[in-house]
């Protein structure tokens, strides 16, 4: 079904407690060089992952709307992934399944939409301009197409600055889950002007 221009999927309003739970602390201490062999090895270890999944809390804050949802992200192969957003009551608000050349999204009324651009689809249906194409790399702790970034003292991403399509995103990582190997991001915050996107990962399963 073609995408409508102004249809918005309604998620429940953001609760104040969620903002606290998803807060990101800017890492302190000296950073490491992006040219270091440790950083190159970490990137390679992450890229070698064939399958992974994570779940946690999602928050979107702007002057126009404040939204909270639980999310589940599952990558099953190269450019094949599934994103699920649920409201605080556990009901599915959005399910997105992507594979090369085809993206399908089902909303909370069971309506199905198709496109070849997941980022554009989510933006039109939710009103939230989520940089999904870049976020697929950022959520793994990889810079993607960004060349302006900083590392923490453990040779992992601590900050990214990236400009594209009139957006100027700054990504700050608040910590990593060291129970997984390689270590994966535990929480992160994306900002562009008055927009903020917060992700707090409860856990990771990597293969």
Curated annotation (Swiss-Prot):
Subunit structure: Monomer.
One Pfam family named in its UniProt record: LolB
Superkingdom: Bacteria
Family of the protein in this entry: Belongs to the LolB family.
Organism per entry: Escherichia coli O45:K1 (strain S88 / ExPEC)
GO cellular component: cell outer membrane
Subcellular location, record wording: Cell outer membrane
Official protein name in the record: Outer-membrane lipoprotein LolB
Lipid attachment in record (N-palmitoyl cysteine): 22
Lipidation (S-diacylglycerol cysteine): 22
Family annotation (CDD domains): LolB
Membrane topology: Lipid-anchor
GO biological process: lipoprotein localization to outer membrane; protein transport
Signal peptide positions (record): 1-21
């Amino acid at each position: 079904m073609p995408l409508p221009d102004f249809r918005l999927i309604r998620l429940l309003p953001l609760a104040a407690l969620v903002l606290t739970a998803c807060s990101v602390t800017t890492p302190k201490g000296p950073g490491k060089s992006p040219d270091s062999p440790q950083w190159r090895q970490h990137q390679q270890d992450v890229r070698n992952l064939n399958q992974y999944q994570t779940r946690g809390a999602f928050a979107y804050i702007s002057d126009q709307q404040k939204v909270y949802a639980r999310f589940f992200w599952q990558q099953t192969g190269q450019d094949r992934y599934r994103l699920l957003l649920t409201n605080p009551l556990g009901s599915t608000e959005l399910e997105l399944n992507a594979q090369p050349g085809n993206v399908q999204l089902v909303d909370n009324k069971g309506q199905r939409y198709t496109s070849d651009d997941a980022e554009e689809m989510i933006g039109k249906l939710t009103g939230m301009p989520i940089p999904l194409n870049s976020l697929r790399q950022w959520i793994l702790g990889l810079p993607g197409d960004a060349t302006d970034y900083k590392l923490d003292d453990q040779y992992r991403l601590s900050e990214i600055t990236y400009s594209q399509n009139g957006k100027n995103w700054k990504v700050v990582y608040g910590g990593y889950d060291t129970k997984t190997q390689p270590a994966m991001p535990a929480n992160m915050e994306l900002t562009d002007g008055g927009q903020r996107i917060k992700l707090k990962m409860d856990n990771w399963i990597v293969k």
